Amino acid sequence: MHTLHWWAVEAEDRDEAFFIVQDRLLMEDGRNWVDWSDWHVVGGGRWSDSQYEDSKDMVISYAEQPELFKERLELIKKLRIDEMNNNLAKVNLDQFTSDMVDYISNSGQPSKEQRFGLNSWYIKRTAEMLQDSYTPDSYFYDFVEYTAHMGYVEERLDNPERPLIQFLVPIDFHF
């Protein structure tokens, strides 16, 4: 599966923003910095004209395109809300409570249904979102603050000294 994420970075220009993300995604030993993804394309990948080549074309500068920057943040919020609504429709809290009781009754062993059931998976996914963990469902990462929380970039936009160096860099992650 593929997911388009936007990373917030501070840089002097579009090129620097792009290279910050490109450089940081691969660790010194060659592993991907994002542990849930096996490969990625910086610049939008399948959402861009470049497809599978890194490209700076879709990088958004707040200084050059403040409205588009804010629109992208609002779109990310909407995507996150949609994910949470999907989880809300799928989670069965009564079943989860029953699974916990059964686990305790079964000497700390999950049943086959518990091990392979989707209810626990949706609950885990929901908890990760509530904790601002960086997952395929985050759609956003703040590389300045090292978090999936979106509030910090919005605070930086309100700071008169910092909005002009804010960039959103798109990444097509495969997982």
Residues of each region from the PLM?
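Phenylalanine-focused residue identity feature
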Residues: 18-19, 69, 96, 116, ...
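Short, extreme N-terminal segment that most often corresponds to the first beta-strand
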Residues: 1-36, 163-175
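A sequence-composition feature that detects small, non-aromatic residues
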Residues: 8-11, 17, 63, 89, ...
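Low-complexity, serine/threonine/proline-enriched polar segments
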Residues: 27-140
